[in-house]
Regions:
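Structural motif
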Residues: 10-11, 41, 151
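Residue-level signal for the start and early helices of compact helical domains
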Residues: 8, 102, 137-139
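Acidic, histidine-bearing metal-coordination/catalytic regions of metal-dependent phosphoesterases
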Residues: 1-22, 28-32
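Charged, low-complexity C-terminal accessory regions
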Residues: 118-156
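Core catalytic region of metal-dependent phosphoesterases/phosphodiesterases
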Residues: 20-133
């Protein structure tokens, strides 16, 4: 008897990594699981990055520095998150998983709020910063539900 009997779709769902604060060992285990399980789809439920450089909490009760001071920190975080995604994508590619979703979380939205404040820096918006389209991810805005079959996925 096949162990897959009755399985409609197999998915790996990962919430709240908060890169660069993520657990590297746990991430390694998830990557190994992806390669073994060979899921039909991958869902990132949001808060992919911590994005502390653009957090409204960062400057609470303090004067916000000029944007020229913030940009290098944002770029460093973007680089870190993209390296993380490169590793995840490598495992997803090995597993043959082509269907990939990413739901923006509240932390991810902070990048978009930053762009709202500095519209000429639109390359720092979350979707563009993580290269969602280039990577082949189906992007879902924060607050939107992702429905697959009878299941709903949401970053709450």
């Amino acid at each position: 008897m096949s162990k897959d009997r009755g399985v409609v779709k197999r998915a790996i769902v990962t919430p709240d990594k908060h890169v660069p604060l993520h657990d590297v060992l746990a991430t390694s285990v998830v990557r190994q699981a992806i390669e073994i399980i060979q899921p039909d789809l991958y869902i990132d439920l949001g808060d992919l990055g911590e994005w502390g450089s653009v957090s409204h909490w960062q400057w609470k009760r303090k004067k916000k520095p000029p944007v020229e001071y913030i940009i290098p920190k944002v770029e460093k975080e973007i680089e870190s998150v993209n390296l993380f995604l490169d590793e995840m994508d490598s495992s997803l590619n090995k597993a043959g998983c082509k269907k990939r979703h990413i739901c923006a979380g509240n932390h991810d939205e902070w990048l978009d709020h930053f762009v709202s404040e500095y519209p000429y820096l639109d390359q720092y918006g979350f979707k563009k910063a993580i290269k969602a389209d280039e990577r082949g991810y189906i992007y879902h805005q924060a607050g939107d539900y992702l429905k697959i079959g009878k299941m709903f996925f949401y970053h709450g």
